[in-house]
């Protein structure tokens, strides 16, 4: 909800504009694939429940996103972002969301395994319903690894600490989350590279908002940033960045061009309110503003 001016009534918020959309890290990546690049060679698995879940499924179908729905008894959550435009700040209000029970978790594992094609790219991004614990994530990874799938990961918190022990092929992580989990400072490239090597991670991508990102791998080390900052509203920019990066890799782009495209997608996301609400023309506008350089660790 967009607030363009202060409220005249204390403790009462009346919005000036509402931007309603189905959201979630996986869905944001799917939206970048489908709506921005017209790419449909993917399937996004949603854990859905209740009336909100039915709305999510309906909107995904309307936007021609390729999704698979797994239903649970609880209801999906509604989150609200209050954008105080006149103060250039935002307040995010997140509901706790549904709880997934033991039987539902076991059913989901079977559902997930049946959907897998050996050797495909698996993207694990964001969170899961309450009750889905670290041990459940490890079971999910076991299934993926048994099918020789490439693991592309963007998670935080306890899951992040556990997943790195499984040496994902690509780990994309926010710099603040990286520091909180592993104690490595933002500018400490040498420690980042030592971390990558010690955990046998092929591609380590660390993002830092408007300050850009670094991509560390055996082939090369790169830094990228946008030379133009259009807005401080960046909700969904990390997901848009990841979507652009994955699309670039899928299309066989070089590391430099994939990172350039990813950075352009992250910047394009700030043009409009709402996660991944930009178009290809926005990416074409921002990509010339992206700087990519080789770095040394």
What are these regions (language model features)?
Residues 1-9:
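Positively charged, low-complexity intrinsically disordered leader regions
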Residues 2, 80-82, 212-216:
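Short beta-strand scaffold segments in enzyme catalytic cores
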Residues 13-77, 286-291:
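Substrate-binding N-lobe of the ribokinase-like
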Residues 33, 174, 238:
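Short, conserved phosphate/pyrophosphate- and ester-handling motifs at nucleotide-, phospho-/glycolipid
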Residues 82-118:
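Conserved phosphate-binding/catalytic loop of the ribokinase/pfkB sugar-kinase fold
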Residues 92-94, 119-127, 154, 170-175:
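Short beta-strands and strand-loop turn motifs
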Residues 135-222:
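Conserved phosphate/ATP/ADP-binding segment of small-molecule kinases
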Residues 161, 189-297:
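Conserved phosphate-binding/catalytic region of the ribokinase-like
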């Amino acid at each position: 909800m967009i607030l363009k001016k202060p409220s005249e009534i204390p403790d009462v918020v009346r919005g000036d504009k509402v931007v309603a959309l189905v959201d979630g890290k996986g869905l944001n990546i799917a939206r970048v694939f489908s709506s921005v690049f017209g790419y449909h060679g993917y399937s996004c698995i949603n854990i859905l429940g209740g009336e909100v879940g039915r709305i999510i499924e309906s909107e995904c179908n309307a936007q021609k996103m390729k999704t698979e729905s797994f239903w649970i008894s609880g209801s999906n959550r509604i989150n609200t972002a209050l954008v105080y435009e006149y103060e250039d700040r935002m307040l995010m209000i997140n509901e706790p969301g549904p709880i997934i029970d033991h039987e539902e978790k076991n059913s989901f594992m079977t559902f997930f395994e049946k959907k897998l094609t050996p050797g495909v790219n698996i993207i694990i991004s964001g969170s899961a319903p309450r009750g889905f614990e670290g041990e459940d994530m490890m079971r999910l990874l076991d299934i993926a690894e048994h099918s020789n799938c490439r693991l592309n990961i963007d998670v935080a918190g306890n899951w992040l600490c556990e997943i790195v022990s499984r040496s994902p092929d690509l780990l994309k992580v926010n710099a603040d989350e990286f520091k909180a989990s592993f104690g490595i400072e933002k500018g400490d490239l040498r420690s980042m590279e030592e971390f990558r090597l010690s955990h046998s991670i092929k591609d380590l991508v660390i993002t830092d908002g408007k300050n850009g990102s670094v991509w560390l791998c055996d082939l090369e080390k790169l830094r990228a940033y946008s030379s133009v900052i259009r807005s401080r509203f960046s909700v969904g920019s990390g997901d848009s960045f990841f979507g652009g990066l994955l699309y670039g890799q899928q299309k066989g782009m070089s590391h430099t061009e994939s990172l350039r495209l990813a950075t352009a997608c992250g910047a394009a996301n700030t043009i409009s309110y709402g996660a991944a609400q930009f178009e290809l023309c926005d990416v074409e506008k921002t990509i010339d503003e992206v700087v990519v350089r080789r770095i040394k660790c």
